[in-house]
Amino acid sequence: MFRNTIRKLTLKPGVTISTGFLIFITIGTVLLMLPVATADGKGTSFIDAVFTSTSAICVTGLIVQDTPVYFSRFGHMVILILIQLGGLGIMTSYAFFSIAIGKRLLISQQVAIKGALDTGYAEIKKTVLVIMLSTFIIEAIGAVVLAIHWSGEHFGDDIFYPIFHSISAFCNAGFSLFNDSLINYSGDVVVNITFALLIILGGLGFIVLSNLYGVFAFFLSRNSKRKLNLHTKIVLTMTGILIILGAILFYVFEHENTLDLLSFKDKVFVSFFQSVTTRTAGFSTVDVGSLTSPTYLYFILFMFIGGSSGSTAGGIKTVTFFVILAVVYKMFRGKEDIEVFERTINRRTVQKAISITIISILTITLFCMLLLYTENVPFKFIIFEVFSAFGTVGLSSGLTPELTTIGKILISILIFIGRIGPLVLALILGREIAERKIRFPEERIVVG
């Protein structure tokens, strides 16, 4: 009976994905605790190693130790590998190495990969190879651009800097080898555009990138049959709207605060960059601790939304947020069907979107209460850190390094939950919804 239970659990995609993340968190923790991983040769404490490993593999970027100073080159390499594996996705990375050595994937692994990448079983191998190839090409281009641009810097001969930051940006990780993130490059056009493009591409998701590649390839072959699917259209629409809206809000709220001493050009670049990075990546070109309260509030909303499904980003995802808005809009219009771009979104998708949102809100509320109990700091900073952790963003008001041991553990758990997703967590803890042959009579209830 016990074996049967274990066997059923391992067949669940959520369990497979979560187990993979936990294994790599453990490996990363052990490696970061080694004396060779730190600059002083003493190794990282267990709690700090767990936190850093979790933050890296879950591509978050929240830190409890100053990454560029505290860790050695070996420690930086460990963090970078964790970021790359976490950005690609544990199952995608495992599938790639299995394909490379000719090993067959287990059924549970195929189910997990199929769910994560929205692909058919027959196309798993092709999809994984395309993802790996496109990832390395994009990251390589980003690294080359940064290496050329940074050639005059004091670290100009060190190719590790551009490689580290290119991977961190594309994987939306937010880890940096600079003490003040990208504040010193707030007016640098090349750095702003390169990082922004890497972050946007990583935040769109492999499903969208694959669809865009397919459309582009068919366009070049003069075959117009391949079109953008509904998912891609929604993602591109929401991404564009959120970037523009975020840039405008940041400029309005900060033009007399953190942007006050900058030129108009630099104000525009900083506003654009912060809008891009706030939902997903966690890099910053301003002092986050000095932001106005309205900016904190809109940052919190953007971190909650996050990036797109199948991407390196966290949050409830742009498509989920779009579906929620569409449901509300259609209810006000007195319509039952959710119709978008001449397509109807099915009820199961709507139920998933609502479930993800509610579970996310409940999770965030719980962790806010726990941290308010364990940490003696204002609510404003607690809620900002909680949303940043859940959305795997990595922006911090400066609270994270000052957390108590219990606080660090709570944030680590929240980062993990935010990365694997509320829906996956619900699948692990509960039973899958099955179709019932017998249904009870329907009856109206009063809500609102």
Which positions does each model-derived feature cover?
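Membrane-proximal intracellular helices of multi-pass ion channels
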Residues: 1-448
